[in-house]
Amino acid sequence: MKKGIHPEYYHDSVVKCACGNTFTTGSTQKELKVEICSKCHPFFTGKQKLVDAGGRVDRFLKKFNLKNEE
């Protein structure tokens, strides 16, 4: 391997989530900021959220005659 071309690797990088959760991991950056993590992601929490983007969800539910479960 050539010397001086590889980025510095930090074994104790801190990852900060928007929900307030923090944990450490290995990375080439000292600090990482993420919007979603395993503590707040719907797949891991079991809570499903429907985000209405301009009434698209309502139109979809109406089109297929489904009930909105919030």
UniProtKB/Swiss-Prot annotation:
InterPro entries: Ribosomal_bL28/bL31-like_sf, Ribosomal_bL31, Ribosomal_bL31_A, Ribosomal_bL31_sf
Keywords: Metal-binding, Ribonucleoprotein, Ribosomal protein, RNA-binding, rRNA-binding, Zinc
Source superkingdom: Bacteria
Physiological role: Binds the 23S rRNA.
Binding site for Zn(2+): 17, 19, 37, 40
Gene transcribed to yield this protein: rpmE
Biological process per Gene Ontology, one example term: translation
Family per record: Belongs to the bacterial ribosomal protein bL31 family. Type A subfamily.
Annotated signal peptide: none
PROSITE patterns for this protein: RIBOSOMAL_L31
Keyword Metal-binding: yes
This protein's record includes keyword Kinase: no
Cofactor note as given: Binds 1 zinc ion per subunit.
NCBIfam families noted in UniProt: L31 (TIGR00105), PRK00019.1 (NF000612), PRK00528.1 (NF001809)
Subunit structure: Part of the 50S ribosomal subunit.
GO cellular component: ribonucleoprotein complex; ribosome
An annotated Gene Ontology molecular function: rRNA binding
Identification of the protein by name: Large ribosomal subunit protein bL31
Cofactor section: Zn(2+)
